């Protein structure tokens, strides 16, 4: 009798020694123990480490996810649903277009259908009014918009082909150190140098602006159009139509007069810019691109630096008198934006 009691007491003592003091009460069946939780955690960490070492190619631009960030929704799906790791993050829609200067390169097919036009020139000549007219804004005809936008994008039909035309009006906005202007030079497909026919000073700045454009992109055959704006102000005119065309012929540019206030020739201007871009691209693809400076067929690089103002004055003073007949003939076609 005493032997059975002693045996039961010995078994209880051994059970108490094996179990911790705080876990004497039996847990319900199916409840995970701390040891099981630790095992599952180690397995998860091991699986993540194996995925990191597997060398799976990640999608370009995929952000690194911290442990505190939520798991993407697609990874919360049931295990029965197949999920491709390369599907995240989602790719950008091809129907969108680039609206900023610092965007990345587009696909070739998309890039061919997007034309970026830069409005450049002195302040007060009507660049913002031209941009607003292109964007379809209805503003005061006597003043420029008080709060103009920076960029306008529209899809237009030119010669039975639909294109996306983006017009930038950022030449003077917060240009500390000229960084923004230099960025414009590297981004635009065509440049519209706007001057006011009522302000001769803005007209005299055109050669300097053009030289800056060509100095920033010396290896590119960029279309440039001289735009004489405010042609409706006949009594205040200081620059004649003949002077504008003559300067355009001298500088190998196109010329057009517009009135942004009356929407005169504004449609012809932007459609002509698209045609000029197409013509230049077609000529470059056909092998008719200008030779690079320094090559046997191109001009020699300048030996020393010279200010843009001096270059403009020397350029006009040397070329116009000797080749006046040539420039007169060239100026006759400078207003036709459908030909080179």
From Swiss-Prot:
Keywords: Cell membrane, GTP-binding, Membrane, Nucleotide-binding, Phosphoprotein. Residues 1-13 have a biased composition (Acidic residues). CDD domains: RGK (cd04148). GO terms for cellular component: plasma membrane. The modification Phosphoserine is found at residues 27, 295. Residues 1-107, 283-308 are annotated as: Disordered. Pfam families: Ras (PF00071). Residues 40-53 have a biased composition (Basic and acidic residues). GTP binds at residues 121-128, 229-232, 260-261. InterPro entries: P-loop_NTPase, RGK_GTP-binding_reg, Sigma_54_int_dom_ATP-bd_1, Small_GTPase. SUPFAM superfamilies: P-loop containing nucleoside triphosphate hydrolases (SSF52540). Residues 93-104 have a biased composition (Low complexity). Residues 293-302 have a biased composition (Pro residues). Belongs to the small GTPase superfamily. RGK family. Binds GTP saturably and exhibits a low intrinsic rate of GTP hydrolysis. This is GTP-binding protein REM 2.
């Amino acid at each position: 009798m005493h032997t059975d009691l002693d045996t039961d007491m010995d078994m209880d003592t051994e059970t108490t020694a094996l179990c911790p003091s705080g876990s004497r009460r039996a847990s319900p069946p199916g409840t995970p123990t701390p040891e099981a939780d630790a095992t599952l955690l180690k397995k998860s960490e091991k699986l993540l480490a194996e995925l990191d070492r597997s060398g799976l190619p990640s999608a370009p631009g995929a952000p690194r996810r911290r442990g505190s960030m939520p798991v993407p929704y697609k990874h919360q799906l049931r295990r029965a649903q197949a999920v491709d790791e390369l599907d995240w993050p989602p790719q950008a829609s091809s129907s969108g277009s680039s609206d900023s200067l610092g965007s990345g390169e587009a696909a070739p097919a998309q890039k061919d259908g997007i034309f970026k036009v830069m409005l450049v020139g002195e302040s007060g000549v009507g660049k913002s009014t031209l941009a607003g007219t292109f964007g379809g804004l209805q503003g005061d005809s006597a003043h420029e918009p008080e709060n103009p936008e920076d960029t306008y994008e529209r899809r237009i039909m030119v010669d039975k082909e639909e294109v996306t035309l983006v017009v930038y009006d950022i030449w003077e906005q917060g240009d500390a150190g000229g960084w923004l202007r230099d960025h414009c030079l590297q981004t635009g497909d065509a440049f519209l140098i706007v001057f006011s026919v009522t302000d001769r000073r803005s007209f005299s700045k055109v050669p300097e602006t053009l030289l800056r454009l060509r100095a920033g992109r010396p290896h590119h055959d960029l279309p440039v159009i001289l735009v004489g704006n405010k042609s409706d102000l006949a009594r205040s005119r200081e620059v004649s139509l003949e002077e504008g065309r003559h300067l355009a012929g001298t500088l190998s540019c196109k010329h057009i007069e517009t009135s942004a206030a009356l929407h005169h020739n504004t449609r012809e201007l932007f459609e002509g810019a698209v045609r000029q871009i197409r013509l230049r691209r077609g000529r470059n693809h056909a092998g008719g691109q200008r030779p690079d400076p320094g090559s046997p067929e191109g001009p020699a690089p300048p030996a020393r630096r010279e200010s843009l103002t001096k270059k403009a004055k020397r350029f006009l003073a040397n070329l116009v008198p000797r080749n006046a007949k040539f420039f007169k003939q060239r100026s006759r076609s400078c207003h036709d934006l459908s030909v080179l």
